[in-house]
């Protein structure tokens, strides 16, 4: 299983320097959407890393697919909505809102 990273240049550069081979630099939402669809079909990708803001800009149906995806597991980093996203992921995994 491999790690894949999708995003703007400033987001993916560190992953590229760290040796991640599947790094997809995208300039706009249309390119991001296209790359996300192809990575979701790639059976060699085990973890997909994206910026939280980029995920938020995707169409609702594709966001739903990412949130429900088991393989690859989608990890959202950065952005203003990270805390609530983490809360939702924990709630989905455990079945209980642990922050209440």
Swiss-Prot record:
Keywords: ATP synthesis, Cell membrane, Hydrogen ion transport, Ion transport, Membrane, Transport. It comes from the Archaea. One of its GO terms (cellular component) is plasma membrane. SUPFAM superfamilies: AtpF-like. GO terms for biological process: proton motive force-driven plasma membrane ATP synthesis. GO terms for molecular function: ATP binding; proton-transporting ATP synthase activity, rotational mechanism; proton-transporting ATPase activity, rotational mechanism. Signal peptide: none annotated. The keyword Membrane applies. Its main location: membrane. It holds the Pfam family ATP-synt_F. It is found in: Cell membrane. InterPro entries: ATPase_V1-cplx_f_g_su, ATPase_V1-cplx_fsu_bac/arc, ATPase_V1_fsu_sf. Gene3D superfamilies: ATPase, V1 complex, subunit F. It is a peripheral membrane protein. Belongs to the V-ATPase F subunit family. Component of the A-type ATP synthase that produces ATP from ADP in the presence of a proton gradient across the membrane. Has multiple subunits with at least A(3), B(3), C, D, E, F, H, I and proteolipid K(x). This is A-type ATP synthase subunit F. The gene is atpF.
């Amino acid at each position: 299983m491999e790690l894949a990273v999708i995003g703007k240049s400033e987001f993916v550069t560190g992953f590229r320097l760290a040796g991640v081979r599947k790094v997809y630099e995208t300039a706009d939402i249309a390119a991001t959407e296209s790359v996300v669809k192809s990575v979701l079909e790639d059976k060699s990708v085990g973890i997909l890393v994206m910026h939280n803001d980029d995920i938020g800009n995707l169409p609702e149906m594709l966001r739903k697919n990412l949130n429900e995806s088991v393989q690859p597991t989608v990890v959202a980093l950065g952005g203003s909505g990270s805390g609530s996203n983490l809360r939702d992921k924990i709630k989905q995994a455990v079945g209980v809102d642990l922050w209440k």
